[in-house]
Protein backbone atom coordinates (compact mmCIF):
# COMPACT_ATOMS: atom_id res chain seq x y z
CA UNK A 1 0.00 0.00 0.00
CA UNK A 2 1.37 3.43 -0.97
CA UNK A 3 2.26 5.70 1.94
CA UNK A 4 0.03 8.82 1.94
CA UNK A 5 1.63 12.23 1.61
CA UNK A 6 -0.42 13.43 4.60
CA UNK A 7 -2.38 11.36 7.10
CA UNK A 8 -4.38 12.39 10.16
CA UNK A 9 -5.61 9.77 12.63
CA UNK A 10 -8.05 10.56 15.44
CA UNK A 11 -6.95 14.19 15.48
CA UNK A 12 -8.95 16.65 17.51
CA UNK A 13 -8.38 20.16 18.82
CA UNK A 14 -10.12 21.82 21.75
CA UNK A 15 -10.23 25.51 22.56
CA UNK A 16 -11.66 26.37 25.98
CA UNK A 17 -13.34 22.94 26.21
CA UNK A 18 -14.94 23.35 22.76
CA UNK A 19 -13.89 20.74 20.20
CA UNK A 20 -13.26 22.75 17.01
CA UNK A 21 -11.73 19.92 14.96
CA UNK A 22 -12.51 16.21 15.26
CA UNK A 23 -11.08 14.19 12.35
CA UNK A 24 -11.18 10.39 12.64
CA UNK A 25 -9.15 9.76 9.48
CA UNK A 26 -8.04 11.96 6.60
CA UNK A 27 -5.46 11.07 3.95
CA UNK A 28 -3.97 13.01 1.06
CA UNK A 29 -2.42 10.76 -1.58
CA UNK A 30 0.94 11.49 -3.16
CA UNK A 31 0.65 13.53 -6.35
CA UNK A 32 -3.02 14.47 -5.98
CA UNK A 33 -4.74 17.82 -5.55
CA UNK A 34 -7.01 17.44 -2.52
CA UNK A 35 -9.67 20.11 -2.06
CA UNK A 36 -10.56 20.79 1.57
CA UNK A 37 -13.95 22.49 1.72
CA UNK A 38 -16.02 23.92 4.51
CA UNK A 39 -17.95 26.97 5.69
CA UNK A 40 -16.08 29.72 7.52
CA UNK A 41 -15.16 28.47 10.99
CA UNK A 42 -15.47 24.79 10.04
CA UNK A 43 -11.86 23.97 11.02
CA UNK A 44 -9.99 24.20 7.69
CA UNK A 45 -7.28 26.63 8.79
CA UNK A 46 -6.84 24.96 12.18
CA UNK A 47 -6.31 21.60 10.45
CA UNK A 48 -3.65 23.07 8.16
CA UNK A 49 -1.92 24.78 11.08
CA UNK A 50 -1.81 21.48 12.96
CA UNK A 51 -0.16 19.79 9.95
CA UNK A 52 2.45 22.58 9.97
CA UNK A 53 2.96 22.35 13.77
CA UNK A 54 1.76 25.95 14.15
CA UNK A 55 -1.05 24.66 16.36
CA UNK A 56 -0.69 21.62 18.60
CA UNK A 57 -3.52 19.06 18.43
CA UNK A 58 -5.17 18.18 21.72
CA UNK A 59 -4.90 14.52 20.74
CA UNK A 60 -4.20 12.29 17.74
CA UNK A 61 -1.44 11.56 15.24
CA UNK A 62 -0.34 13.39 12.09
CA UNK A 63 2.05 11.90 9.54
CA UNK A 64 3.82 13.46 6.56
CA UNK A 65 5.30 11.00 4.08
CA UNK A 66 4.75 8.27 6.65
CA UNK A 67 6.72 10.00 9.43
CA UNK A 68 5.21 11.57 12.57
CA UNK A 69 5.41 15.35 12.57
CA UNK A 70 7.23 15.31 15.91
CA UNK A 71 10.33 15.10 13.70
CA UNK A 72 10.53 18.73 12.57
CA UNK A 73 12.71 17.88 9.56
CA UNK A 74 9.46 17.11 7.68
CA UNK A 75 8.84 20.86 7.29
CA UNK A 76 11.51 21.07 4.59
CA UNK A 77 9.17 18.98 2.37
CA UNK A 78 6.22 21.38 2.73
CA UNK A 79 5.62 24.77 1.15
CA UNK A 80 2.70 26.65 2.65
CA UNK A 81 0.49 29.65 2.06
CA UNK A 82 -1.51 30.17 5.24
CA UNK A 83 -3.58 33.32 5.69
CA UNK A 84 -2.03 36.59 4.45
CA UNK A 85 1.76 36.34 4.11
CA UNK A 86 4.01 39.10 5.47
CA UNK A 87 6.24 40.98 3.05
CA UNK A 88 8.78 43.76 3.13
CA UNK A 89 6.86 46.35 1.08
CA UNK A 90 9.93 48.42 0.19
CA UNK A 91 11.79 45.45 -1.31
CA UNK A 92 11.37 43.68 -4.65
CA UNK A 93 10.11 40.11 -4.92
CA UNK A 94 13.68 38.86 -5.34
CA UNK A 95 14.87 40.78 -2.28
CA UNK A 96 11.99 39.43 -0.21
CA UNK A 97 12.84 35.85 -1.18
CA UNK A 98 16.54 36.53 -0.54
CA UNK A 99 15.72 37.53 3.05
CA UNK A 100 13.67 34.32 3.34
CA UNK A 101 16.62 32.33 1.94
CA UNK A 102 19.00 33.81 4.51
CA UNK A 103 16.60 32.78 7.29
CA UNK A 104 16.07 29.19 6.10
CA UNK A 105 19.30 28.44 4.25
CA UNK A 106 17.92 26.91 1.03
CA UNK A 107 19.83 27.27 -2.24
CA UNK A 108 19.91 30.92 -3.38
CA UNK A 109 19.91 29.72 -7.00
CA UNK A 110 16.27 28.66 -6.57
CA UNK A 111 15.01 32.25 -6.33
CA UNK A 112 14.99 33.45 -9.96
CA UNK A 113 13.60 30.18 -11.41
CA UNK A 114 10.82 30.29 -8.80
CA UNK A 115 9.90 33.87 -9.70
CA UNK A 116 9.85 32.85 -13.36
CA UNK A 117 7.45 29.99 -12.57
CA UNK A 118 4.97 32.35 -10.90
CA UNK A 119 5.31 35.08 -13.55
CA UNK A 120 7.16 37.73 -11.51
CA UNK A 121 10.58 37.68 -13.22
CA UNK A 122 9.74 39.60 -16.40
CA UNK A 123 11.21 43.06 -17.11
CA UNK A 124 8.02 44.84 -16.08
CA UNK A 125 7.93 43.26 -12.61
CA UNK A 126 11.49 42.30 -11.63
CA UNK A 127 12.35 45.75 -10.21
CA UNK A 128 8.89 46.63 -8.90
CA UNK A 129 8.56 47.08 -5.14
CA UNK A 130 6.04 44.83 -3.42
CA UNK A 131 4.12 47.87 -2.12
CA UNK A 132 3.16 48.55 -5.76
CA UNK A 133 1.88 45.02 -6.39
CA UNK A 134 -1.75 44.24 -7.15
CA UNK A 135 -3.49 41.68 -4.92
CA UNK A 136 -3.05 39.04 -7.64
CA UNK A 137 0.70 39.72 -7.82
CA UNK A 138 0.94 39.43 -4.03
CA UNK A 139 -0.77 36.03 -4.24
CA UNK A 140 1.80 35.00 -6.87
CA UNK A 141 4.57 36.12 -4.53
CA UNK A 142 2.98 34.10 -1.71
CA UNK A 143 3.10 31.06 -4.00
CA UNK A 144 6.76 31.83 -4.71
CA UNK A 145 7.47 31.76 -0.96
CA UNK A 146 5.76 28.35 -0.79
CA UNK A 147 7.66 26.97 -3.81
CA UNK A 148 11.17 28.34 -3.40
CA UNK A 149 12.28 25.58 -0.98
CA UNK A 150 11.52 22.98 -3.69
CA UNK A 151 8.88 21.18 -1.59
CA UNK A 152 7.05 18.00 -2.52
CA UNK A 153 3.84 19.10 -0.76
CA UNK A 154 1.95 22.41 -0.98
CA UNK A 155 -0.53 23.53 1.69
CA UNK A 156 -2.63 26.41 0.36
CA UNK A 157 -5.23 28.03 2.61
CA UNK A 158 -7.77 30.07 0.59
CA UNK A 159 -5.22 31.05 -2.12
CA UNK A 160 -7.80 32.97 -4.19
CA UNK A 161 -9.32 34.87 -1.28
CA UNK A 162 -10.16 38.46 -2.20
CA UNK A 163 -9.33 38.12 -5.89
CA UNK A 164 -11.59 39.18 -8.75
CA UNK A 165 -12.75 36.50 -11.26
CA UNK A 166 -9.76 37.12 -13.56
CA UNK A 167 -7.34 36.83 -10.63
CA UNK A 168 -9.03 33.64 -9.41
CA UNK A 169 -8.67 32.13 -12.88
CA UNK A 170 -4.97 33.11 -13.04
CA UNK A 171 -4.10 31.58 -9.67
CA UNK A 172 -6.16 28.47 -10.40
CA UNK A 173 -4.35 27.85 -13.69
CA UNK A 174 -0.99 28.51 -12.03
CA UNK A 175 -1.69 25.96 -9.28
CA UNK A 176 -2.78 23.36 -11.85
CA UNK A 177 0.29 23.98 -14.00
CA UNK A 178 2.69 23.78 -11.05
CA UNK A 179 1.08 20.66 -9.61
CA UNK A 180 1.22 18.76 -12.90
CA UNK A 181 4.64 19.96 -14.10
CA UNK A 182 6.35 19.42 -10.74
CA UNK A 183 4.40 16.36 -9.58
CA UNK A 184 3.46 18.13 -6.36
CA UNK A 185 0.93 16.99 -3.79
CA UNK A 186 -1.44 19.90 -3.12
CA UNK A 187 -3.73 20.24 -0.10
CA UNK A 188 -5.89 23.29 -0.84
CA UNK A 189 -8.67 24.77 1.28
CA UNK A 190 -11.43 27.02 0.02
CA UNK A 191 -15.07 27.95 0.39
CA UNK A 192 -15.31 28.71 -3.37
CA UNK A 193 -16.79 25.44 -4.57
CA UNK A 194 -16.48 26.02 -8.32
CA UNK A 195 -12.73 26.65 -8.05
CA UNK A 196 -12.12 23.42 -6.13
CA UNK A 197 -14.28 21.54 -8.63
CA UNK A 198 -11.98 22.83 -11.41
CA UNK A 199 -8.63 21.92 -9.80
CA UNK A 200 -9.10 19.03 -7.35
CA UNK A 201 -8.80 15.30 -7.96
CA UNK A 202 -10.53 14.51 -4.66
CA UNK A 203 -12.44 16.57 -2.12
CA UNK A 204 -13.20 16.44 1.56
CA UNK A 205 -15.91 18.53 3.23
CA UNK A 206 -15.45 19.56 6.86
CA UNK A 207 -18.42 20.84 8.86
CA UNK A 208 -18.28 21.82 12.53
CA UNK A 209 -14.90 20.12 12.76
CA UNK A 210 -16.02 16.77 11.30
CA UNK A 211 -15.16 15.30 7.90
CA UNK A 212 -18.68 14.75 6.55
CA UNK A 213 -17.83 13.82 2.96
CA UNK A 214 -14.90 12.57 0.90
CA UNK A 215 -14.98 11.60 -2.76
CA UNK A 216 -13.48 11.79 -6.24
CA UNK A 217 -14.44 14.85 -8.26
CA UNK A 218 -14.86 12.73 -11.42
CA UNK A 219 -17.33 10.48 -9.57
CA UNK A 220 -19.41 13.52 -8.61
CA UNK A 221 -19.52 14.72 -12.21
CA UNK A 222 -20.55 11.26 -13.45
CA UNK A 223 -23.75 11.23 -11.37
CA UNK A 224 -26.25 12.28 -14.04
CA UNK A 225 -29.96 11.79 -14.57
CA UNK A 226 -32.91 12.95 -16.69
CA UNK A 227 -35.87 14.96 -15.42
CA UNK A 228 -39.13 15.24 -17.38
CA UNK A 229 -41.68 17.85 -16.39
CA UNK A 230 -45.35 17.56 -17.30
CA UNK A 231 -48.72 16.29 -16.14
CA UNK A 232 -48.75 12.56 -15.43
CA UNK A 233 -51.00 9.80 -14.17
CA UNK A 234 -48.37 7.89 -12.21
CA UNK A 235 -49.68 4.32 -12.48
CA UNK A 236 -50.31 4.71 -16.21
CA UNK A 237 -46.81 6.15 -16.81
CA UNK A 238 -45.07 3.37 -14.88
CA UNK A 239 -46.98 0.74 -16.85
CA UNK A 240 -46.17 2.33 -20.22
CA UNK A 241 -42.46 2.87 -19.43
CA UNK A 242 -42.15 -0.75 -18.35
CA UNK A 243 -42.96 -1.77 -21.95
CA UNK A 244 -39.66 -0.16 -23.09
CA UNK A 245 -37.79 -1.39 -19.99
CA UNK A 246 -37.41 2.03 -18.39
CA UNK A 247 -37.96 2.29 -14.62
CA UNK A 248 -38.23 5.75 -12.98
CA UNK A 249 -36.05 6.67 -10.00
CA UNK A 250 -38.88 8.89 -8.82
CA UNK A 251 -42.28 9.93 -10.13
CA UNK A 252 -45.02 12.38 -9.21
CA UNK A 253 -47.92 13.98 -11.07
CA UNK A 254 -45.56 16.79 -12.18
CA UNK A 255 -42.13 15.19 -12.54
CA UNK A 256 -40.42 11.98 -13.64
CA UNK A 257 -36.78 11.28 -12.71
CA UNK A 258 -34.89 8.68 -14.77
CA UNK A 259 -31.38 7.32 -14.73
CA UNK A 260 -29.06 8.78 -17.37
CA UNK A 261 -30.20 7.71 -20.86
CA UNK A 262 -28.91 8.06 -24.41
CA UNK A 263 -30.58 10.57 -26.73
CA UNK A 264 -32.35 7.72 -28.56
CA UNK A 265 -33.69 6.30 -25.31
CA UNK A 266 -34.91 9.72 -24.17
CA UNK A 267 -36.73 10.11 -27.50
CA UNK A 268 -38.34 6.69 -26.97
CA UNK A 269 -39.45 7.68 -23.46
CA UNK A 270 -41.00 10.94 -24.69
CA UNK A 271 -42.80 9.12 -27.51
CA UNK A 272 -44.15 6.55 -25.06
CA UNK A 273 -45.39 9.25 -22.68
CA UNK A 274 -47.07 11.19 -25.49
CA UNK A 275 -48.78 8.00 -26.65
CA UNK A 276 -49.99 7.60 -23.06
CA UNK A 277 -51.58 11.06 -23.42
CA UNK A 278 -49.19 12.75 -20.98
CA UNK A 279 -48.56 16.50 -21.36
CA UNK A 280 -44.80 17.19 -21.47
CA UNK A 281 -43.32 20.68 -21.10
CA UNK A 282 -39.64 20.02 -20.19
CA UNK A 283 -36.94 17.40 -20.67
CA UNK A 284 -33.60 18.13 -19.00
CA UNK A 285 -30.34 16.33 -18.30
CA UNK A 286 -29.08 16.97 -14.75
CA UNK A 287 -25.61 16.53 -13.26
CA UNK A 288 -24.81 16.49 -9.56
CA UNK A 289 -22.44 19.27 -8.53
CA UNK A 290 -20.11 19.76 -5.62
CA UNK A 291 -22.40 22.60 -4.56
CA UNK A 292 -25.35 20.17 -4.29
CA UNK A 293 -23.37 17.90 -1.97
CA UNK A 294 -21.89 20.77 0.04
CA UNK A 295 -25.19 22.54 0.67
CA UNK A 296 -26.96 19.30 1.56
CA UNK A 297 -24.29 18.35 4.12
CA UNK A 298 -23.69 21.77 5.68
CA UNK A 299 -27.18 23.26 5.77
CA UNK A 300 -28.40 24.11 9.24
CA UNK A 301 -31.39 22.10 10.38
Describe the residue ranges of each PLM region.
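Conserved catalytic motifs of ABC-family nucleotide-binding domains
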Residues: 150
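Conserved ABC transporter NBD signature motif
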Residues: 60-74
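Catalytic Walker B motif of ABC-type/P-loop ATPase nucleotide-binding domains
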Residues: 154-158
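Conserved ABC ATPase "signature" region
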Residues: 98, 102, 109-125
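Short, charged/small-residue-rich alpha-helical element at the C-terminal edge
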Residues: 226-292, 297
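ABC transporter nucleotide-binding domain
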Residues: 172-258
Amino acid sequence: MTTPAIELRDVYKEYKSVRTVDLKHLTVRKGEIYGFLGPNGAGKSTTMKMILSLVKPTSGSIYVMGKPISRRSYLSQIGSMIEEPSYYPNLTAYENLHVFQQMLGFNKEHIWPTLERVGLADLKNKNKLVRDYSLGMKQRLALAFALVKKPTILLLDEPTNGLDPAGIHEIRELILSLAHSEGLTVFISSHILSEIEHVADRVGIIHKGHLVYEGEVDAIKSNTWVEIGGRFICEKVVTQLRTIEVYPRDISTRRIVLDSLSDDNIAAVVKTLVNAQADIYAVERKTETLEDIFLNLTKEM
